[in-house]
Amino acid sequence: MKRGNISRKVAASVMTGAMMVSMAGMSVCAAPIVGDGDHAIEAVPVQKTVATDGHIYAPDTSFSFRVANGGEGTFEGNVVSAGVTGGLAADENAVFTPSGTTPLVSYTSNGSLAVDGSVFTSPGVYHYLVTEASGDYEGMDYDNSTYDVYLYVYNSNNGLYVGNAVSVKNGDKADLAFTN
């Protein structure tokens, strides 16, 4: 009887350890990476959050984003080339429209950046810088963060394609998310 209890405790400990290891792996894998590398991606999502004091409705405006070619260097052991113009471009703005009967403490909208694999001439990792464009909406603060975005260009039988995009803020992988 004691042996059965010990076996159950050991099994429970092993299962707990396995769950902890698998959960740790999930947090690493949940990094802000778009694409699986095997298929071409066409867009990179960008999120905009407007925080309020809870007494203001969503602003009736949109927020746009800017993309600039980044410089050469290294990222995660890969040689990185400067971005190629047109490989990553601002596409859809994050649009807000007042609605509802109760103001919220924050409002979130999504925009996107367009990916164009046809502009690349060789496989590799390409670097871009993404920022929020400052606007003139009265009383609005704009996020001055800069994200490094790395596009991974692969070669297949059908030619070059962008299979992954990784966004980084202050040296850490992070979703492309701007907050006022």
Where are these regions (language model features)?
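Solvent-exposed loop/turn and edge beta-strand elements of beta-rich ligand-binding domains
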Residues: 2-180
